[in-house]
A protein has these predicted regions:
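Active-site phosphate/pyrophosphate-binding segments
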Residues: 2-39, 132-134, 140-147, 151, ...
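Catalytic-loop motifs flanking and including active-site residues across diverse enzymes
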Residues: 52, 56, 151-156, 224, ...
């Protein structure tokens, strides 16, 4: 039986290889992007790829100094395709088989925008859609994007750093500091996995008994909250939803009951103080409040991954997302293991046959 743990353990090696071969692996996309003075980057993605884009959006925007937006493929096809000519459209698809993303690439080509595609398989059907196709470098063997998520974040971080350097919006000293910070984050992935395993073992009974799980983040942490909820949804079948930090307190908190679990993500940065305030207040509503933190100052229910080396070196975003996704992945697999259940929900088989999503 396949396990998410196998791919979590493989991820640091994959991320390190992408970093070490960045000129070869990422250079082509950087050259394409820097060929013209694009003033906007619009990322089109679905599922985990959307969550990856949301996780790295703030980092890319801060590094490149241009507006970066993220949208879903069908919304792009039907409504959001009226992009200015100076917009670079980047479509993400892990498998390269997502029918909605393939159609979005075709729409962007039809509109006349420059289109690039990032995928784990350049030989997949998306290659025929007409965009400039680049491979992340994580390979096609994966399980619920266990290694694909952090490796894709690594790739996008490198794209932002290298493109910003080529465009002249990032000084050499800052570029080198960010590369070093990214390397440090990759080096901390195994430690994050070990901490996550210990944390999940300690709190596994609370996790498996949860009637509802709510994940909360801000900035890049919101992208992680989205992916965390998705992993819990698709692997365990537990009802889980993600919320932006401030929107969470404008209604959704009224739903919370004592048997609900709330998982907060704090990567540091501007939302840190408010997130700490939220974590303390939530104990009035439920005893099951957990924090995945790349910072310090939380109670015993926090999983502190260690402060990020990527902060305050020229980017307003935090590269700790590469480590901070691991606890969510670990929790989903730990629940499956504890309940001795297959992660694939077989009752959805007929539905998926009717609503095809892969080419």
């Amino acid at each position: 039986v396949r396990s998410m743990y196998t791919y979590i353990e493989q991820a640091p090696t994959v991320c390190r290889a992408i970093l070490d071969t960045r000129d070869e692996r990422v250079g082509g996309l950087v050259q394409l992007f820097c060929a013209r003075p694009y003033r906007r980057l619009h990322i089109v993605a679905s599922g985990s790829s959307y969550n990856i884009a949301m996780t790295m959006r703030d980092f890319l925007q801060a590094a490149l100094g241009i507006e970066v937006t993220v949208g879903w493929p069908m919304s792009y096809i039907l409504y959001d395709h009226l992009q200015p000519g100076d917009t670079f459209v980047l479509c993400l698809s892990q498998s390269g088989k997502s029918t909605n993303t393939i159609a979005a690439v075709e729409k962007a080509v039809e509109r006349g925008n420059t289109v690039a595609v990032l995928t784990c398989n350049a030989n997949a059907p998306i290659d025929a859609a007409g965009g400039n196709v680049f491979e992340y470098g994580s390979g096609t063997d994966d399980y619920y994007v266990g290694k694909g998520f952090p490796s894709s974040c690594t790739y996008l971080a490198l794209f932002g750093i290298m493109a910003a350097s080529m465009r002249g919006t990032l000084e050499d000293e800052t570029r080198d500091a960010l590369i070093d910070a990214l390397s440090t984050e990759i080096g901390g992935m195994q430690d994050a996995f070990e901490k996550a395993q210990a944390f999940c073992a300690e709190h596994i009974n609370e996790l498996v008994r949860a009637r509802r799980i709510m994940t909360v983040g801000i900035g890049g942490g919101y992208g992680l909250a989205l992916e965390g909820a998705l992993k819990l949804n698709e692997m365990t079948g537990i009802a889980a939803n993600a919320y932006e930090m401030e929107e969470f307190v404008h209604g959704p908190t009224y739903e919370i009951r004592k048997d609900h679990v709330v998982m907060l993500v704090d990567l540091g940065g501007p939302g840190h103080e408010r997130m700490m305030q939220l974590s303390q207040a939530l104990h009035l509503l439920t005893d099951h409040v957990f924090v995945i933190a790349a910072t310090e100052g939380y109670d015993e229910y926090s999983l502190e991954l260690g402060t990020s080396s990527g902060r305050n070196v020229g980017s307003k975003s935090d590269l700790a997302a590469i480590r901070a996704i691991i606890p969510f992945q670990t929790a989903a697999e730990a629940i499956c293991s504890k309940l001795d259940m297959l992660s694939y929900n077989l009752v959805n088989f007929d539905f998926e046959q009717e609503m095809k999503t892969k080419a």
